[in-house]
Curated annotation (Swiss-Prot):
This is Cellulose synthase-like protein D2. GO terms for molecular function: cellulose synthase (UDP-forming) activity. One of its GO terms (biological process) is cell wall organization. Keywords: Cell wall biogenesis/degradation, Coiled coil, Glycosyltransferase, Golgi apparatus, Membrane, Transferase, Transmembrane, Transmembrane helix. Residues 527-551 form a coiled coil. Thought to be a Golgi-localized beta-glycan synthase that polymerize the backbones of noncellulosic polysaccharides (hemicelluloses) of plant cell wall. The chain crosses the membrane at residues 311-331, 341-361, 955-975, 981-1001, 1027-1047, 1070-1090, 1104-1124, 1134-1154. Residues 10-24 have a biased composition (Low complexity). It is a multi-pass membrane protein. Its EC number is 2.4.1.-. Residues 1-75, 269-295 are annotated as: Disordered. The gene is CSLD2. Disulfide bonds: none annotated. It is an enzyme of class 2 (transferase).
Length: 1170
């Protein structure tokens, strides 16, 4: 088979797959999928330094001895020359099944690189890490080499990693040499005895029979045909398998009961329908299914638990009462002016009007809170129980791709990321349906080797978790549990196993911590060797001439002695953070379809895993290409690169993204989220958001890091409308919702009461039928049927990616096991094995993560994560809700995920600053909720409007925090007198606020302390970070000044002496100035007010009490901030004293200048000292 202008000939020898490249005629990486051709594999040569270099045009010319009389045209003609070798008895193609298996073995051991103006290379990794890789799925796993002289290929291995040797003498031979030996007489090259089995498939063993019928004509199905075959209807599959159905085998394997089709068993619906019986016809049988399966009562996967009316009704009533009281109070304030201090009255009224609007925007979306519950037993019964459509009981759950993002190993410790990866690999979800993608946006070798170490340690950790039901499955968190680890453990070998795994984990931590030094020493050694070689070559070339010092860029070297294609420790051209090639490494290749049980400890393994499935999910390292001149779009761009590469490699219909410091705390969390997606009506759910829970927070939660009011009050309330907002991590997405498609059966909402009081549906039958037939729809198209020809303009020109879209849509549908399930799929459709990885697939994945792929497409505009905001998560969720998708809030009994949060005051303020800046950007962009479509409900629109408007409250909040001080300084108050009407309004507003807080605590489950901490930090953040966010947002909108933020540093868990050491570190930032000024001004004002009242001729105690009360209210909210300034030992930083002194002097001078003291010598009236 000849290549399409790839500059080389394709070879059948599997050992040559390690030297392959995917290139076009111009040497540039081709646009993927062009013309529907699969990427071709061509040769590359290996240099003396171990690097693989493709055969460019110059290389080919030099290889052929290009002379001066050879024209460029002749060189180009040679490049496009094709040779097709016909099949002969000595040149027979390898069996497709065996060839695919051989190729997958090499693909999983190869590091793929490529991108802009470069070919896609696959570099065989003989060694990925310094330590030995033992698991057969892992890249660089130990394998034997072929014993034939001159052959560098690896011996075929089985699923356990053991060598497959065709002769009893155990002579090691690869697949190609074995085929040559059979052709040349069939004798073993080692012992010279004839082979007993001369067919390679007899040696390797045939693969399990697929559950789908073979392709017509007996021809092997192509990759796309196999992937599309699952979309056949269940009726067609049942008819095609009628003759091959073995009832006895099914009864034996599923432990069923004899009855269906039995002479004693009555025929189903024989009277009514004339069908039924053993053939399964009629309604009772349900398309050939036994009635004992279809007669089961249908059970939902999820339930909506409404808030008790005894709590919700008073809560709604109080909201209405407080709304009315606020309106009356504001009207009274406007009518009754303070003529003595109009400036004070005017500022207070404006602030109170804004606070009333802000409270209304925050409170209205809380009218419809709900709770939800899942039933995992029903999920297992529907998707993993043997049925006629799934006789072997294979998992019928859809595939799930997990995205883990990291960018800087210095601020995000590799050990934290590795523990997150281990918790994902050990999750309780079908191994063959789970894939994990790690996005390293920094392209660091440290992250790469840390992930390889994690994959190696997973060989022991994951089976250990499955064997003993370990929770949590993050080793760092598990071994640091404060509770008894042996509680409820009944296996006699648990103590021995735990001790062994703990020792292995300690060694694993040491290896991770030593990686930076190991990489540095290795790079120094290889760099010294290269310098010596360069100097030697220079001396040989210069002879007696003066030799200048050789300067070679100091590269970063991998464990196998080759250059790292990503970012070097000392950045160089094409090896810097913003300039490096795309990299993909399959750390753990896709597992086999059937369970693979381990061996006993006597057979050489450290632990006894004889009854444990030792397979591991697929793990892929991805670092997208970055080049100068291309906008990388930060985290959103990295996520979109993962969406495209995962669509090509595994195409899971669902995606779950996690930050590198958020690990899986509940091993069944994936199943909990899948319950919502697979339930009736689940095809309209765009994403399932899990709450964020944090570890390492100080017991008092000084800075409201747990954020329970938002996650347990606001998010539960939004779940009763259209669903919660997307908060950036711990979210399960439907892939086609990320692709920008509309949900099925979407409708428009016109009224403001449709959220809590839905109107009767009036939908035309023809419209429903049309939407059921139309699986994929986009808002940009008015045609009834989707115009597939427009897909390349939206998604790019990758045919692999475009062809995967309808497959992902079909696989993401719920089961059609109930008449109420719309747009469902037949049971058993997802029990087919996944395709093996081949070189063209990974080469295509390299192409879709290149820097130029998104040019002239809608990625980041309407497709995938949305660009243009530092809070891309909120914007992405808003776009889905705006298209009509719903979201669900999944609160599990055991926390689904846990992560870390910055407990340092400065880090916390910068985190809030980033969130608030993103909200300001949203308000001034096209994503403003005022411009939302009619597919978004009214209260959902109010919630998103509040997201964009809340930072502006800081302007009025700061003014209002100074009003008590101004009142005390001036001797005036916001009202003329503290009369009964004002005090009554104030009392009612305060009481209703407290009662609402109590009821929120009642239905949300938070504590009063958490509610109060949230109130305190609302004022701290509102007077510091929110104000800075408004200023930065206005600068970006008006002046076009871009805003850059640094990553929040994650704790590596090394502070064993003090877990909360960061809490007491005082790091100065300009964000602290406004709260410090507010505190100092109010303290000085209280002192001035007391002194004036005491020494005045006519003391006005009512105004003093009013001003002092509000000043103390402000200071009470700022108490955590003041405590944070004192550090560990209660020492206030010197800069605070300096600011306080300057502030006191400034205020005193200003006050003397504005209001000079009177000439009355009798200060203080009749009061005299004794």
């Amino acid at each position: 088979m000849a290549s399409n202008g790839g500059g080389g000939l394709r070879h059948s020898n599997s050992s040559r797959l390690s030297r392959m490249s995917y290139s076009g005629e111009d040497g540039r990486s081709q646009a993927p999928g062009g013309g529907g051709d699969r990427p071709m594999v061509t040769f590359a040569r290996r240099t003396h330094s171990g690097r693989y270099v493709s055969y460019s045009r110059d290389d080919l010319d030099s290889e052929l001895g290009n002379s001066g009389d050879m024209s460029p045209e002749s060189g180009q003609e040679f490049l496009n020359y094709h040779v097709t070798i016909p099949a002969t008895p000595d040149n027979q193609p390898m069996d497709p099944a065996i060839s695919a298996r051989v190729e997958e073995q090499y693909v999983s051991n190869s590091l793929f690189t490529g991108g802009f103006n470069s070919v896609t290379r696959a570099h065989l990794m003989d060694k990925v890490i310094e330590s030995e890789a033992s698991h057969p799925q892992m890249a660089g796993a130990k394998g034997s080499s072929c014993a034939i002289n001159g052959c560098d290929a690896k011996v075929m291995s089985d699923e356990r990693g053991d060598d497959i040797l065709p002769c009893e003498c155990d002579f090691k031979i690869c697949a190609d040499c074995f085929a040559d030996a059979v052709k040349n007489g069939g004798a073993c090259p080692g012992c010279k005895d004839p082979y007993k089995a001369t067919e390679l498939d007899d040696v390797v063993g045939a693969r399990p029979t697929l559950s789908l019928p073979p392709p017509p004509g007996g021809l092997p199905a192509s990759r796309m045909e196999r992937r599309l075959s699952i979309m056949r209807s269940q009726k067609a599959m049942t008819r095609s398998q009628t003759g091959d159905w073995d009832h006895n085998r099914w009864l034996f394997e599923t432990k069923g009961t004899y009855g269906y089709g039995n002479a004693i068993w009555p025929k189903e619906n024989e009277v009514d329908n004339g069908g039924g019986g053993g053939g399964g016809g009629g309604l009772g049988g349900g398309d050939g299914q036994p009635a004992e399966f279809t007669s089961k009562p249908w059970r939902p996967l999820t339930r909506k638990l409404k808030i008790p009316a005894g709590v919700l009704s008073p809560y709604r009533l109080l909201i209405l009462i407080r709304m009315a009281v606020l309106g009356l109070f504001l009207a009274w304030r406007i009518k009754h002016k303070n003529e003595d201090a109009m400036w004070l009255w005017g500022m207070s009224v404006v602030c109170e009007l804004w606070f009333g609007l802000s409270w209304l925007l925050d409170q209205l979306p809380k009218l419809c809170p709900v709770n939800r519950a899942t039933d995992l037993a029903v999920l297992k019964d529907k998707f993993e129980t043997p049925t006629p459509s799934n006789p072997n009981g294979r998992s019928d759950l859809p595939g799930l791709d997990i995205f883990v993002s990291t960018a800087d190993p210095e601020k995000e410790p590799p050990l934290v990321t590795a523990n997150t990866i281990l918790s994902i690999l050990a999750a309780d979800y079908p191994v063959e349906k789970l894939s994990c993608y790690v996005s390293d946006d920094g392209g660091a070798l440290l992250t790469f080797e840390a992930m390889a170490e994690a994959a190696s340690f997973a060989n022991m950790w994951v089976p250990f978790c499955r064997k003993h039901d370990i929770e949590p499955r993050n080793p760092e968190s598990y071994f640091n549990l404060k509770r008894d680890p042996y509680k409820n453990k009944v296996r006699s070998d648990f103590v021995k196993d735990r001790r062994r795994v703990k020792r292995e984990y300690d060694e694993f931590k040491v290896r991770i911590n030593s990686l930076p030094d190991s990489i540095r020493r290795r790079s120094d050694a290889y760099h010294a060797r290269e310098e010596i070689k360069a100097m030697k070559r220079q001396r040989e070339a210069a002879l007696d001439d003066v030799v200048e010092a050789v300067k070679i860029p100091k590269a970063t070297w991998m464990a196998d002695g080759t250059h790292w294609p990503g970012t070097w420790i000392q950045p160089s051209a094409e090896h810097a953070r913003g300039d490096h090639a795309g990299i993909i490494q399959v750390m753990l290749k896709p597992p086999s379809d059937d369970p693979l049980y381990g061996t006993s400890s006597e057979e050489g393994r450290p632990l006894d895993f004889t009854e444990v499935d030792i397979r591991l999910p697929m793990l892929v390292y991805v670092s997208r290409e970055k080049r100068p001149g291309y906008d990388h779009n930060k985290k959103a761009g990295a996520m979109n690169a993962l969406v495209r590469s995962s669509a090509v490699m595994s195409n899971g219909p669902f995606i779950l993204n996690l930050d590198c410091d958020h690990y899986v705390y509940n091993s069944q969390a994936f199943r909990e989220g899948m319950c919502f997606m697979m339930d009736r009506g689940g095809d309209r759910i765009g994403y399932v958001q899990f709450p964020q829970r944090f570890e390492g927070i100080d017991p008092s939660d000084r800075y409201a890091n747990h954020n329970t009011v938002f996650f347990d009050v606001n998010m539960r309330a939004l779940d009763g409308i259209m669903g919660p907002v997307y908060v950036g991590t711990g979210c399960l997405f439907r892939r086609i919702a990320l692709y920008g498609f509309d949900p099925p059966r979407s409708k428009e909402h016109s009224g403001c009461c449709s959220c809590c009081f839905p109107q009767r549906r009036k939908v035309k039958t023809s419209t429903v039928a049309s939407e059921e037939r139309q699986a994929l729809r986009m808002a940009d198209f008015d045609d009834e049927e989707m115009n597939m020809s427009q897909f390349p303009k939206k998604f790019g020109n990758s045919n692999f990616l475009i062809n995967s879209i309808p497959i992902a849509e079909f696989q993401g549908r719920p089961l059609a096991d109930h008449p109420g399930v719309k747009n469902g799929r037949p049971p058993g459709a997802l029990t087919v094995p996944r395709d093996l990885l081949d070189a063209s697939t990974v080469a295509e994945a390299i192409s879709v993560i290149s820097c130029w792929y998104e040019d002239k497409t809608e990625w980041g505009q309407r497709v995938g994560w949305i660009y243009g905001s530092v809070t891309e998560d909120v914007v992405t969720g808003y776009r889905m809700h705006n298209r009509g998708w719903k979201s669900v809030y999944c609160v599990t009994k055991r926390d689904a995920f846990r992560g870390t949060a910055p407990i340092n005051l400065t880090d916390r303020l910068h985190q809030v600053l980033r969130w608030a800046t993103g909200s300001v950007e949203i308000f001034f962009s096209r994503n403003n909720a005022l411009l939302a479509s009619r597919k978004m409900k009214f209260l959902q629109r109010i919630a998103y409007l509040n997201v964009g408007i809340y930072p502006f409250t800081s302007i009025f909040l700061i003014v209002y925090c100074f009003l008590p001080a101004l009142s005390l300084f001036s001797g005036q108050f916001i009202v003329r007198t503290l009369n009964v009407t004002f005090l009554t309004y104030l009392l009612v507003i305060t009481l209703t606020m407290c009662m609402l807080a109590v009821l929120e605590i009642k239905w949300s489950g938070i504590s009063l302390e958490e509610w109060w901490r949230n109130e305190q930090f609302w004022l701290i953040g509102g007077t510091s970070a929110h104000l800075a966010a408004v200023l930065q947002g206005l600068l970006k909108v008006i002046a076009g000044i871009e805003i850059s933020f640094t990553l929040t540093s994650k704790s590596g868990g090394d502070e064993a002496d003090d877990e909360f050491a960061d809490l007491y570190i005082v790091k100065w930032t300009s964000l602290m100035i406004p709260p410090i000024v507010i505190m100092m001004v109010n303290l000085i004002a209280i002192a001035v007010g007391f002194s004036r009242t005491i020494y005045s001729e006519i003391p006005q105690w009512s105004k003093l009490l009013g001003g002092v009360f509000f000043s103390f209210w402000v200071l009470a909210h700022l108490y955590p901030f003041a405590k944070g300034l004192m550090g560990r030992r209660g020492r206030t930083p010197t800069i605070v004293f300096v600011w306080s002194g300057l502030l006191a002097i400034t205020i005193s001078l200003l006050w003397v200048a504005i209001n000079p003291p009177s000439q009355n010598s009798q200060i203080g009236g009749s009061f005299t000292f004794p």
